[in-house]
């Protein structure tokens, strides 16, 4: 009922309720529509977030279980690196004396450590080569009929330094003309305590004619960059190490006009070899691990400290025509 008295004397409670100050009263139907719209927006955001999280989980799972295939090679339009233009002077640091790594050879042979060389009687042919390159602690004593004796260069991994220097009569005195090229991460080669460089320098005091070089830190990065450029894979992210074979092949291409590789199998060898046939990984370790078991385990391992041997061989195959590389025993391109 309306108040018959003046407005100032009317009770406030007698006034009809109105909307709060500053707010506009909305019709009930509109409020319902807005509430429904807000719910739909929240649902859409939830669905999008759920989809993104699911995609991330699946991607992480696939990445963790990814097989290291050569399928993701460098882009076809990418111009390959010309290894012939790499600077020898900047890439290899003298450990003993102040010399520069001797280069060039017209014709080089790489003698692999493969047991495929056993029984080949290639020794005389290898001896006639202008320059002969061997790896790590692969001996010639007792195997010269198949692998020869001549050693112009020996490429040695940081993990094989002690195995080589413990047998100086085999690796230093037997072929005094040998030039040693040691490779390894700077943390291994030049760490403050127990530096491998110091170990090699002490050996040089005992054998003054020994000539040795280390792959420089800058060149080590180039080797990594080369692998990433050729395969599309980052070595560190794939939890692997480049093999001594990788370093040896690149060094041979740098130093030599033509390269003949003995004993290295093609990348598809293990998929075609009869399962019951066993071949030792090294010719000088007849009871050592099987060749294909070693290749396959290293290729697919995700636990680190492994080599991608098969992937590297595919890269070598792509280099064959580009750099004049020949493979034999077995023969392939």
Curated annotation (Swiss-Prot):
Glycans are attached at residue 98. Its EC number is 2.4.99.-. Residues 65-333 are lumenal. Disulfide bonds join 108-256. One of its GO terms (molecular function) is alpha-N-acetylgalactosaminide alpha-2,6-sialyltransferase activity. Expressed in kidney, in proximal tubule epithelial cells. Expressed in colon cell lines. Keywords: Disulfide bond, Glycoprotein, Glycosyltransferase, Golgi apparatus, Lipid metabolism, Membrane, Sialic acid, Signal-anchor, Transferase, Transmembrane, Transmembrane helix. Residues 1-12 have a biased composition (Polar residues). Residues 1-43 are cytoplasmic. Induction: Down-regulated in renal cancers. InterPro entries: Glyco_trans_29, GT29-like_sf. This is Alpha-N-acetylgalactosaminide alpha-2,6-sialyltransferase 6. It comes from Homo sapiens (Human).
């Amino acid at each position: 009922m309306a108040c018959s008295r003046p407005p100032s004397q009317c009770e406030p409670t007698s006034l009809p309720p109105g909307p709060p100050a500053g707010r506009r009263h909305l019709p009930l139907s509109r409020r319902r529509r807005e509430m429904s719209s807000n719910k739909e927006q929240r649902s859409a955001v939830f669905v999008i977030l759920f989809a993104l999280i699911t995609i991330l989980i699946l991607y992480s799972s696939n990445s963790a279980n990814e097989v290291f295939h050569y399928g993701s090679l460098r882009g076809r339009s990418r111009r390959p690196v010309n290894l012939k233009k790499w600077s020898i002077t900047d890439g290899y640091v003298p450990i003993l004396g102040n010399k520069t790594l001797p280069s060039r050879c017209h014709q080089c042979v790489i003698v692999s450590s493969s047991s495929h060389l056993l029984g080949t009687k290639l020794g005389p042919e290898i001896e006639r080569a202008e320059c002969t390159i061997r790896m790590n602690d692969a001996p010639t004593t007792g195997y010269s009929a198949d692998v020869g004796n001549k050693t112009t260069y020996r490429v040695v991994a940081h993990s094989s330094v002690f195995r080589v220097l413990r047998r100086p009569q085999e690796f230093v005195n037997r072929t005094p003309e040998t030039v040693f090229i040691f490779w390894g991460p700077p943390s291994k080669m030049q760490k403050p305590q127990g530096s491998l460089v110091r170990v090699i320098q002490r050996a040089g005091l005992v054998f003054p004619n020994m000539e040795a070089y280390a792959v420089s830190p800058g060149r080590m990065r180039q080797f990594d960059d080369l692998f990433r450029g050729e395969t599309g894979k980052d070595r560190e992210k794939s939890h692997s190490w480049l093999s001594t074979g990788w370093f040896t092949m690149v060094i041979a291409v740098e130093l030599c006009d033509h390269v003949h590789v003995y004993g290295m199998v093609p990348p598809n060898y293990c998929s075609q070899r009869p399962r019951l046939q066993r071949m030792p990984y090294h010719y000088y370790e007849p009871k050592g691990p099987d060749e294909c078991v070693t290749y396959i385990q290293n290729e697919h391992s995700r636990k680190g400290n492994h080599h991608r041997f098969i992937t590297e061989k595919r890269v070598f195959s792509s280099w064959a025509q580009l750099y004049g590389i020949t493979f034999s025993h077995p023969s392939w391109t």
